[in-house]
């Protein structure tokens, strides 16, 4: 049985979206057991399943505007800290939260701990592509600054995940840069390029540009945390703007526009789905001793369900255990 702890109070639509996602996952997956951390009365209001679900009551929670490190130190009975502690103590095997990102990073580092040999855990998520396959990208903001050595480790971590969790036999690893030529970039990217090109355990395909990300040019994209977070927010904003603009144009375009939209209904839904983060799962804080996964703050029940499915696969493939062995052997 795979035991997964969840912060039921984290996120914009908690606990409703969290619990509804759990209801669906429990119904679909007979090999998972979920521990919900949060306000029992509020959780029970939406909980429809009773088997393989337990509630650990606490009224304390970390808010979105709390200072991350201080909140983790001071709010030891919060739903987030208790969930992370459950993983540390072996009560749960993985932890999910849609709450304060910085606080989750702090809880992951200070409570769960990083894998020996990993310098800086990175935040990794599977990003959408036009063909629906997606690519894994890290770091998406766990670290504001990185060294070439960090990017080298991210390439190994990302390749490991793509192969073992997503089932890509030989993942293509690309370095996000301001040009595809080998000589492009600042000193950080030039040094990182040399390290990645010399790494025998990955299939490094060279530099890639941001404009090509959604064209499936790579299975794993490596970048520093500052750039990665900026790219993530840009992709999210662009997707929202495109869909919003299409909707406005159809509404204001008269009968012809509405008829055209009706004829293109299936194609428009396909476009919407290709840009939808909710089916990809959450962002993994990769490099820790256990799977710690961050749901988007605005996650609905579908996104929570997808994240539970993702974590179930991570536990099934024992990707973190394999990583521990790999880095210990180095």
Swiss-Prot record:
Xref: InterPro entries: FA_synthesis, Phospholipid_synth_PlsX-like
Signal peptide from the UniProt entry: none
Compartments where found: Cytoplasm
Entry EC no(s): 2.3.1.274
Claim: Lipid biosynthesis is one of the keywords in the record: yes
Record's catalysed reaction(s): a fatty acyl-[ACP] + phosphate = an acyl phosphate + holo-[ACP]
Pathway annotation from the record: Lipid metabolism; phospholipid metabolism
Transmembrane segments: none
Coiled-coil regions listed in the entry: none
Cellular component terms (Gene Ontology): cytoplasm
HAMAP family linked to this entry: PlsX
Subunit structure of this chain's protein: Homodimer. Probably interacts with PlsY.
PANTHER family per record: FATTY ACID/PHOSPHOLIPID SYNTHESIS PROTEIN PLSX, PHOSPHATE ACYLTRANSFERASE
Function: Catalyzes the reversible formation of acyl-phosphate (acyl-PO(4)) from acyl-[acyl-carrier-protein] (acyl-ACP). This enzyme utilizes acyl-ACP as fatty acyl donor, but not acyl-CoA.
Family membership noted in the UniProt record: Belongs to the PlsX family.
Protein name: Phosphate acyltransferase
Organism, as annotated: Streptococcus agalactiae serotype V (strain ATCC BAA-611 / 2603 V/R)
